Amino acid sequence: MSEIATMAQGEAGAIGPGRLVLVVGPSGAGKDTLLQLAQAACIDDHDVVFPRRVVTRESSAAEDNIAMSPDEFRRGIDHGDFAVHWDAHGHSYALPLEINDDIRAGRAVVVNVSRTVIAALRQAYANVVVVAITAPPDVLAQRLAARARHSDGNIAERLSRSVEDASAQADVTILNAGSADYHSRQLVRVIRNESWRE
């Protein structure tokens, strides 16, 4: 599996002053659920942006991505439509180039990414905050089995996957094993650069 981030060309220096909030974590941790709740909580905050990822997989109720075919995705790369793109789990993922304008305007941009692209994003953006959302292994396994998404592949393999990269260390970790509302409030506090514990 190849998970190498490729950044848009032509950017000089780290992009800022806004914050890039990277939400990472294992499959089944509840990242999409917490992101949806956080987005709803920030709906009237124009300084917080939740861009839709571009993915070569159909969108679903749990993951509101922009679906593209592999050919369309390749054309997007060729046209410079993405701020960053990577491949993981048999799919291609990208963040739209417009996030750079939001960050230059001082907004917080909140995105779900692979842990393997954190190092490249920390270099490209001036103010990066990594939020790891996780859950106990038995909870992860239950959630993956319950969603029964074909593209999840081998559940045991997904659960055993790790990233050995110091730059992938989280700045904040949320153990999402209780109330999704409670944990989404923690995430909102991080997004707004407030204390994240209650």
Curated annotation (Swiss-Prot):
Swiss-Prot/TrEMBL keywords: ATP-binding, Nucleotide-binding, Transferase
Gene Ontology CC entries for this record: cytosol
Function description: Catalyzes the phosphorylation of ribose 1,5-bisphosphate to 5-phospho-D-ribosyl alpha-1-diphosphate (PRPP).
Catalytic reaction list: alpha-D-ribose 1,5-bisphosphate + ATP = 5-phospho-alpha-D-ribose 1-diphosphate + ADP
Pfam families: Guanylate_kin
Claim: Manganese is one of the keywords in the record: no
Pathway this chain belongs to: Metabolic intermediate biosynthesis; 5-phospho-alpha-D-ribose 1-diphosphate biosynthesis; 5-phospho-alpha-D-ribose 1-diphosphate from D-ribose 5-phosphate (route II): step 3/3
SMART domains: GuKc
Species the sequence originates in: Bradyrhizobium diazoefficiens (strain JCM 10833 / BCRC 13528 / IAM 13628 / NBRC 14792 / USDA 110)
GO BP, one annotated term: organic phosphonate metabolic process
The name this protein goes by in its record: Ribose 1,5-bisphosphate phosphokinase PhnN
Enzyme class: transferase
Family note: Belongs to the ribose 1,5-bisphosphokinase family.
A Gene Ontology molecular function term of the record: ribose 1,5-bisphosphate phosphokinase activity
Keyword check for rRNA processing: no
Enzyme Commission (EC) number: 2.7.4.23
Residues reported to bind ATP: G25, P26, S27, G28, A29, G30, K31, D32
